[in-house]
C-alpha cells in the first residue's frame, strides 16, 4: 500500500482521476485510496468515496484505517494520513497531521 501511495504522492489533484484508468495524470481522493489499495492487491477496480463506506470490515484496523463519507475518503496507515485536498491543487500526500473524523464511516481492509 505504501509503495503504491508513494508512486502517486507527487501527482496533482484531478477530479475523477484514477477512475477511468489506474495510471492517470492526477488523482482525486477515492482514486488515490483505490490506487494504493490496488497496488497491494486489495482492489480490482476503483471505488468512489461512497463505495468505501461499505468496503472492507467495520471499525479501525490494526495498521490501515479508511475514513469515508459520500464526498471524501482518506486513509491512515500506522499513524500517517494519505489524503488529498483539491483546494490548493495538491493531490495525494502523506501527512503527519490528523484531521477530524466526525461524520466519517470507519472501515479497514480485513486482517490489516
Predicted regions and their residues:
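...with weaker cross-activation on analogous glycine-rich loops/strands in unrelated enzymes
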Residues: 2, 34-112
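Active-site nucleophile-His-acid catalytic modules used for acyl/amide transfer and hydrolysis
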Residues: 8-26
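Compositionally biased, intrinsically disordered low-complexity regions enriched in proline and serine
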Residues: 14-16, 28, 68, 105
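Active-site nucleophilic cysteine motif
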Residues: 21-40
Amino acid at each position: 500500500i505504501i509503495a503504491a501511495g508513494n508512486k502517486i504522492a507527487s501527482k496533482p489533484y484531478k477530479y475523477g482521476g484514477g477512475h477511468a484508468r489506474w495510471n492517470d495524470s492526477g488523482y482525486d481522493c477515492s482514486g488515490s485510496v483505490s490506487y494504493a489499495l490496488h497496488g497491494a492487491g486489495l482492489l480490482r477496480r476503483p471505488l468512489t468515496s461512497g463505495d468505501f463506506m461499505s468496503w472492507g470490515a467495520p471499525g479501525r484496523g490494526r495498521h490501515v484505517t479508511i475514513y469515508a463519507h459520500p464526498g471524501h475518503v482518506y486513509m491512515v496507515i500506522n499513524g500517517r494520513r494519505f489524503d488529498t485536498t483539491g483546494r490548493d491543487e495538491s493531490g495525494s500526500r502523506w501527512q503527519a497531521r490528523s484531521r477530524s473524523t466526525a461524520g466519517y464511516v470507519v472501515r479497514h481492509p480485513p486482517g490489516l
